C-alpha cells in the first residue's frame, strides 16, 4: 500500500507499507508453450560453441587470485551471428577446486554503470565471475561499443528493454537470459570449479537474471540471491512503476499493439513465470520504498518459487538499493548450502 500524508493541501510524506506479502497473488499469464519456448532457446544456445577466451590481467593479479578478462560466445540476436559477451573471472592461484559465485549486473542505464572487477585478494577461497550480458557494461564501452549500434535504432540508445519489443523470438531478453545460461556453461567448463557448488546473485536486472539462471540453468545452481529484482508481473508493474512502463507504452504505440498482445509477449520474460521453474534455495532482498522495482513486483516471483527453502529480507527504508550488509547476508546463505566435495 502507498500512503500519502498531506497537510494544508501539501504533501508532507509518502511511503509504502505492507503486510502478509506471501499472500500476494499475481494473475497467472504463463502461456501454454512457455516451457517449449525456453527449451528451444536452450537448444539453439547449445549449438553455439562457447569459444571462451581468457586473458590474464597481470596488473590485477598480484594477490591470491588471478584475474582474467574473459570473452565467450552466446546465442544470436536474430541475425544468425553469435553475440560476444564479456566479463571478469577470478580464480585462486593455489591448487584445488573452489565454489563459485556468478554475479549478474543491473541495467546499464546511460552507459554509466560501474564495471565491477573482482579483487585479487577478495572473497578468499572462492571463484568469481562477473558477467556483462549482451550490449551492456563492458560490451557497451570502447573498444566494443560499435558492436551495439543496432540496439538503439528501436527506440533510444542504451534502452535494451525496447530491442525487438513485441517479437518474442528475437527480443533482447531472450538472448540476455541465454547469456545467463552461457555464464553457467562457462563456469562448468573450468577445471578449478566445484560443479556441485555454483551460486548466483544480482540486483535489479541482475536479480531477474539470477532467477532466470535458476529457472533455465538445468539445476546447476545450488542457491540464488536476487535483490530488488526487475521484470516481475508486468501487468501490475506497469500500474505502479513509471519505467519500463514508459518504454513499453512507447513501443506499444509504435507497433500498434493492444494490451492483451503486449502482455502475452512479455509473459515469456516475466520472472513470476520463470519462478515456477525454480527449485533451489533462494534468499531475496526487497526495498519497501523501491519506486523502480516496487515490492509487489518482487513478491510476484518470490511467491511462485517452488523451492523448499526460501527467505526474503524486506528493508523498510530502502528504495532501489540494498543495505550495506546484504553481501555478507547472501554469502553466509551460500556458505550454508555448500555441498561436500569428494576428491
What are the residue ranges of the model-derived segments?
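Hydrolase active-site cap/lid region
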Residues: 140-144, 207-258, 314, 325
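C-terminal catalytic histidine-bearing segment of alpha/beta-hydrolase fold enzymes
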Residues: 234, 292, 299-343
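Short beta-strand/loop motif that positions the catalytic acidic residue
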Residues: 277-286, 290
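Alpha/beta-hydrolase fold nucleophile elbow
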Residues: 193-204
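Short beta-strand elements
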Residues: 7-36
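Cap/lid segment of the alpha/beta-hydrolase catalytic domain
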Residues: 107-178, 236-245
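Short beta-strand element of the alpha/beta-hydrolase
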Residues: 86-91, 96-108, 128
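N-terminal cap/lid segment of alpha/beta-hydrolase-fold proteins
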Residues: 32-35, 44-96
Amino acid at each position: 500500500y502507498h500512503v500519502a500524508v498531506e497537510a494544508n493541501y501539501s504533501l508532507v510524506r509518502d511511503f509504502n507499507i505492507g503486510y502478509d506479502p506471501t499472500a500476494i497473488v499475481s494473475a497467472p499469464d504463463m502461456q501454454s508453450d512457455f516451457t517449449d519456448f525456453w527449451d528451444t532457446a536452450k537448444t539453439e544456445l547449445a549449438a553455439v560453441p562457447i569459444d571462451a577466451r581468457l586473458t590474464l590481467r597481470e596488473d590485477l593479479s598480484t594477490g591470491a587470485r588471478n584475474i582474467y578478462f574473459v570473452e565467450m560466445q552466446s546465442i544470436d540476436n536474430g541475425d544468425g551471428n553469435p553475440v560476444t559477451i564479456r566479463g571478469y573471472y577470478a580464480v585462486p592461484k593455489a591448487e584445488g577446486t573452489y565454489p563459485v559465485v556468478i554475479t549478474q549486473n543491473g541495467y546499464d542505464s546511460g552507459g554509466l554503470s560501474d564495471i565491477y572487477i573482482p579483487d585479487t585478494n577478495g572473497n578468499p577461497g572462492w571463484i568469481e565471475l562477473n558477467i556483462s550480458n549482451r550490449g551492456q557494461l563492458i560490451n557497451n564501452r570502447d573498444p566494443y561499443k560499435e558492436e551495439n549500434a543496432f540496439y538503439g535504432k528501436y527506440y533510444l540508445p542504451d534502452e535494451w528493454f525496447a530491442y525487438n519489443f513485441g517479437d518474442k523470438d528475437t527480443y533482447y531478453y531472450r538472448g540476455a537470459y541465454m547469456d545467463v545460461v552461457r555464464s553457467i556453461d562457462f563456469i562448468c567448463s573450468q577445471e578449478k570449479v566445484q560443479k556441485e557448488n555454483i551460486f548466483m546473485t544480482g540486483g535489479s536486472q541482475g536479480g531477474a537474471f539470477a532467477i532466470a539462471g535458476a529457472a533455465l540453468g538445468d539445476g546447476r545452481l545450488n542457491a540464488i540471491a536476487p535483490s530488488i529484482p526487475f521484470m516481475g508481473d508486468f501487468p501490475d508493474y506497469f500500474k505502479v512503476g513509471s519505467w519500463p512502463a514508459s518504454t513499453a507504452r512507447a513501443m506499444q504505440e509504435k507497433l500498434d499493439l493492444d494490451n492483451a498482445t503486449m502482455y502475452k509477449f512479455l509473459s515469456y520474460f516475466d520472472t513470476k513465470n520463470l519462478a515456477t521453474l525454480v527449485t533451489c534455495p533462494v534468499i531475496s532482498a526487497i526495498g519497501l520504498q523501491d519506486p523502480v522495482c516496487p515490492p509487489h513486483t518482487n513478491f510476484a516471483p518470490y511467491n511462485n518459487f517452488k523451492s523448499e527453502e526460501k527467505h526474503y529480507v524486506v528493508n523498510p527504508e530502502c528504495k532501489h538499493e540494498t543495505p550495506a550488509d546484504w553481501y555478507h547476508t547472501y554469502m553466509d546463505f551460500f556458505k550454508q548450502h555448500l555441498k561436500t566435495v569428494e576428491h
